[in-house]
Amino acid sequence: MKGNRNPPPPPSGPVPPSPTSKNTAKYTNKDGSKFITVPKMNTPIDSAQPSPTASSLAAKPALPPGPETEPPQTVNRKKQKRRAKAAAKAAAERAQNSPAINGLPSPSPTNDQQSADADPEDDEDEPGTGHDSGNQSLYLNGGAHGGAPGKSKKSKKKKKKNATGPAGGFPNNNPYAQDDRDHSPEPILPPPPPQQNRPGMSREKIWNTNSQEERERIKEFWLGLSEAERKSLVKVEKDAVLKKMKEQQKHTCSCTVCGRKRTAIEEELEGLYDAYYEELEQYANHPNQGEGPPMLRPRRSFGSMGGMRPRGLHSRFSNHQPSRGRIVDELEGDEEEEEVEAEAEDDGEGDEEGEDVYSEDELEDDMYSEEEQEPSEELHRSDYAADFFNFGNSLTVQGRDRLPILPSFLQNYPFSGTGNNAYGSSSLGGILTVADDLLKNDGKKFIEMMEQLAERRMAREEDARGQFERAYDHPNGERYVHSHPPPPDEEEFEDEEEEYEEDDEEEYNSPDEEDTMTEEQRMEEGRRMFQIFAARMFEQRVLTAYREKVAKERQAKLLEEIEAENQQDAQRKAKKAKDAQRRKDRAAKKKEAQAEEKARREAEKAAEEAARRAEEARKAEEQRAKAEEKRKKKEAQRKAEEEERQRKEAERLRKIQDREEAERKAREAREREKKTREEARLREKEAREQKERKDRERREQQERERREKEAKAKAEREAKEAKEAKEAKEGKDTKERRKKEERAAHKAAALAPAIPVPITLPKRSATQQPPAPPVAPVPVLPQQSTSYASPKVPVATPALPKAPTPMRARQTSQQDGSTASSGAASNSGSMASQNPSPHPITPVHASPGLMAPPSKSGVMGIGSQGSAQPPSHSASPMSFPAKLLPPQHSPFGIPPMGSAMSYPPPGLSQMPLGFANPLHREPLFPPMPGFRPASGMMPMPPGLNGPGVNRGFPLHPPPGFLGGPMESPAPSMAQAMSPGLQRDNQSPHSRQGSGSFDPSQPISRPTPIGRPASVVQGQRPSNWSPSSGPPKPEPEAHLGSRALLDDLDDGPQDFPGRLSRGGSAPGPRPAPGFPMPPFGMDPMFSHNPWAPPGVVQPNLFGPHPPPSFSPLSAHTPMGMPWGHAMPSASTFGTPGAVDRPIEPRSVAVRKMLRRACEDLANAGSAEGRDSFIPLEMIKVQVENFNHGYPIDEKDLLDICETEGNEVNGGGSFDVVNDGQGGRSIRFVSGDQRTAPQPVQLAVGYNPGSPIGGGR
């Protein structure tokens, strides 16, 4: 603490000498595991050593004391110095007189062993001191180096707190001042006890310099170097240190004092190095000089050491005599520090890379901790030279006998002590670490340490001066802020020095006078100190060079050993590879033998297999030959059969053609004959009609005159009666009059002629026409014949009596003479229904009616209206004979089965049953829309789903459906087989049935009331009727869903026999054998007007042929004429065969075409299945399938272009030209080929020939 002159002793220190041995001292390690005993002269104990201050302890905590440490004894300082000096001289004499081992001086019992056995692992065992592994003890100037006046206790305390910096003004460029700065608070440790070699050193003996062989090798290495190589090892230091010092000080303070400080450092370093080089060179020239160190003359550069003032330094510092007393550092933790130093030595030696122990952080921490210490009150009595000596003492030089290459003056130099404060007593790590810093870091840390020491020294001088002035009342009372105060007067300094010396004398209570050192001794001491420093640096460089050489040798040897090992490995691998190859060869030979054996067995087996296969092939060939021969025979037989069949087929076709030709000729002859007869009959009829017309005109004239008279009388009576009942019956008369007018209009329209030929109507007599009653009674339905069983209830329909007509149809000449009123009434009633359409331009159609009940005269009332029109086929379809055979009665008035066709229909007695006469191939009569039951078939009773009330023609198809009465395949058959040709006897009154769809009539007389003509799609006027004129093209109207279709959506229209779209309505088909009723007429015993057609036929809704001639059904060959008998069709009996699903004609023809191609390809007619077959052969085959009815080649080619699917047989047809104008066809089966559906010839179904158009 500040001002504490007598602090308590440090907690740890060297063990005092035992009382039995006064000349020895025992030092132990911190943990007591190591101890060493050294002579007492080597371990002088300063009794006046101060304890560290609180700040220094805070900056660097003291290590715990060892188990045997005690506070040191307090001895007289002056006596201690004298004893140390004597001991140093004695040690020097002993070193000179003792025998050298291998040219080396005998080491002390502690230092040599300590330096050799420095423990590098204590840094790990004691982490508390690991960062101070390179620390060195601070050796200050002691009594052994001169007789400088002793210092007071204050001065010693000040030196202890600032032990890192010298007291003098020597700058901080000394490389070994780093130990002073970094470890100033650390106590001086005793040398550690001997230790065993570490395992690392045993593993790397290359760095072990303890053995005699190693020393000999180092010596030989040194002696083997040339002069230039030796100089190169030691010449580097001076230039490197000076260069680095200049670089580091370029940016420092540029004041005069700092400049002088730098100059002094450079000069001192240069002088020291020059002196050392001269002595080293002298030693090199005289290597065996071992008598004492040569004493060189003092140089100019050593003047500062001897108290001379350096250049530029004030006289105050030069006049001051350096103190003889040395500043002793703390003794606390001596043992530990010695061990740490030893560890640093070994670390530095064992590491090739020379790891630097000093770190910049540690340097800064130590620097700050020292700067933070409060300056003590003691004054520093040292000057520039004394600081340099202190710096020299801080250079830890150890193991001077390590290497045999040092000069003899250094080897035999007698140090003043070998203990804690001796130069060679501490670890080698310090000097070697500083040397490593110079070698590896270019002395950067060394230069920084010297600068820091210089700065702190100047700061301490400033503080000391300030404290001195405050303590002793400076007369001027001046305070200087700058770190370089002006030098005080010499007189004042002398007074202060005297007072300080007095305080020292009083404090130590020692009457002895301090010894004084001469200038020459100080110079010699400083020179020797630097020589030791330089020698250790030189030793480090030699040792480093030797290590590098040994490392290279060891590396080369290691490479040789590695190469030898590689060769051995290669030989071993080669041997293994050879053995493996030998084994592989043996295995390969064995495998080859096995393969040969296996090949032999396989060859034998293959030979057997080949023989067996040859035998099998021979047998297969024989079987193939037999099969081929059999196939050829079968093929020849099949060809013969096919040729025979084709010949027969050709013969049959020829016969068919001949028969058709004969039939055609016969038909043409019959048609010509019939035409001739018809022409004759027409001529006769025209003549007869002309005569009748004249008679009728005459009678009509008479009748008209009679009626006029009667009418006049009647009009008078009626006028009279009307006048009487005018008021009462005015409304009723008006209504009756309107009805009369309406009836008159209807009668006029019914009696109007088809062709407006001017005729003269004779008046009828009054007796021939009964007078009309004033009030028309409501008539009832006429009495029906009991021979008709009507399933419907008759409904009475009110009707007015007919108005008188201006004309009356004349009775035919074939009628009986009796003209009963009932017959006339029946005739007039039937005549009223001849024109159901009231429009005047509607042509008159024959109104078919049912067979009327027998009249009184025994003649069936089938309509007996006479025809007085010209022979241009007017409304009367044909002329029936006046007298008919009496009917054959049966229950319900139905003719017996088979008797209806025993005689031809009226007017067709000359026709053959088959209607093959050419006359009926032409539209001779207008189409009769009525219906007549066939022979053996029950006629339709009135009201039993027949043609319908007041409708003797079939309904036209709905809009969009094709077909009609004009599209019947045989219109003449519809005319010939219509049952009621003259009358519609179902209604006794003359009312027009609603829903009439008759063609329009030519223009006639205007009538009061007229209805617009009914326009029905698909119905056209007769193309042969003279009243309608020539046929006019009518654009086809698209109605219903057909209006939404495009014109092309209806498919090919020109295909013969093609069914139109929508040709079949949903519903069940009729049983085979029943005829298909026309559209609008229900089938018998059915009430579904939309019953579907039973078979596919070209005309779906038109009138059908007679039931005995079955329509196009499954039993009718395609294109078969109407005159041919059906194969097995019955009129009203069981069907000839089972019905089958109906398919379109194009599908059936395509299937037959495919079947024909396949049959011809399989029959061998072509070269193969992929060959083309001529179209003529295919056509013949298809006609054979079609029962000989011809099919056009163009139709076949068109069908070939259709795409195959699962319905029409699949596949496709290829058509090519054979180059001669012919075509050939080939069928190619597709991926989704379906099995062809064979045509069932047993049922007699064929789609029909395109030529026939499906007739």
UniProtKB/Swiss-Prot annotation:
<feature type="compositionally biased region" description="Basic residues">
    <location>
        <begin position="151"/>
        <end position="162"/>
    </location>
</feature>
<feature type="compositionally biased region" description="Acidic residues">
    <location>
        <begin position="118"/>
        <end position="127"/>
    </location>
</feature>
<feature type="compositionally biased region" description="Basic residues">
    <location>
        <begin position="76"/>
        <end position="86"/>
    </location>
</feature>
<dbReference type="GO" id="GO:0005737">
    <property type="term" value="C:cytoplasm"/>
</dbReference>
<feature type="compositionally biased region" description="Pro residues">
    <location>
        <begin position="1067"/>
        <end position="1080"/>
    </location>
</feature>
<feature type="region of interest" description="Disordered">
    <location>
        <begin position="470"/>
        <end position="525"/>
    </location>
</feature>
<feature type="region of interest" description="Disordered">
    <location>
        <begin position="956"/>
        <end position="1080"/>
    </location>
</feature>
<feature type="coiled-coil region">
    <location>
        <begin position="547"/>
        <end position="745"/>
    </location>
</feature>
<comment type="similarity">
    <text>Belongs to the NST1 family.</text>
</comment>
<feature type="compositionally biased region" description="Basic and acidic residues">
    <location>
        <begin position="637"/>
        <end position="745"/>
    </location>
</feature>
<feature type="compositionally biased region" description="Basic and acidic residues">
    <location>
        <begin position="470"/>
        <end position="481"/>
    </location>
</feature>
<comment type="function">
    <text>May act as a negative regulator of salt tolerance.</text>
</comment>
<dbReference type="InterPro" id="IPR051195">
    <property type="entry name" value="Fungal_stress_NST1"/>
</dbReference>
<feature type="compositionally biased region" description="Basic and acidic residues">
    <location>
        <begin position="201"/>
        <end position="214"/>
    </location>
</feature>
<keyword id="KW-0175">Coiled coil</keyword>
<feature type="compositionally biased region" description="Acidic residues">
    <location>
        <begin position="330"/>
        <end position="376"/>
    </location>
</feature>
<feature type="compositionally biased region" description="Pro residues">
    <location>
        <begin position="1"/>
        <end position="19"/>
    </location>
</feature>
<feature type="compositionally biased region" description="Pro residues">
    <location>
        <begin position="187"/>
        <end position="196"/>
    </location>
</feature>
<feature type="compositionally biased region" description="Polar residues">
    <location>
        <begin position="865"/>
        <end position="877"/>
    </location>
</feature>
<dbReference type="InterPro" id="IPR025279">
    <property type="entry name" value="NST1"/>
</dbReference>
<feature type="region of interest" description="Disordered">
    <location>
        <begin position="563"/>
        <end position="898"/>
    </location>
</feature>
<keyword id="KW-0346">Stress response</keyword>
<feature type="region of interest" description="Disordered">
    <location>
        <begin position="1"/>
        <end position="214"/>
    </location>
</feature>
<feature type="compositionally biased region" description="Polar residues">
    <location>
        <begin position="983"/>
        <end position="1004"/>
    </location>
</feature>
<protein>
    <recommendedName>
        <fullName>Stress response protein NST1</fullName>
    </recommendedName>
</protein>
<feature type="region of interest" description="Disordered">
    <location>
        <begin position="285"/>
        <end position="379"/>
    </location>
</feature>
<feature type="compositionally biased region" description="Pro residues">
    <location>
        <begin position="770"/>
        <end position="780"/>
    </location>
</feature>
<keyword id="KW-0963">Cytoplasm</keyword>
<feature type="compositionally biased region" description="Low complexity">
    <location>
        <begin position="50"/>
        <end position="61"/>
    </location>
</feature>
<feature type="compositionally biased region" description="Basic and acidic residues">
    <location>
        <begin position="590"/>
        <end position="630"/>
    </location>
</feature>
<feature type="compositionally biased region" description="Acidic residues">
    <location>
        <begin position="488"/>
        <end position="518"/>
    </location>
</feature>
<feature type="compositionally biased region" description="Low complexity">
    <location>
        <begin position="811"/>
        <end position="835"/>
    </location>
</feature>
<feature type="compositionally biased region" description="Low complexity">
    <location>
        <begin position="87"/>
        <end position="96"/>
    </location>
</feature>
<dbReference type="Pfam" id="PF13945">
    <property type="entry name" value="NST1"/>
</dbReference>
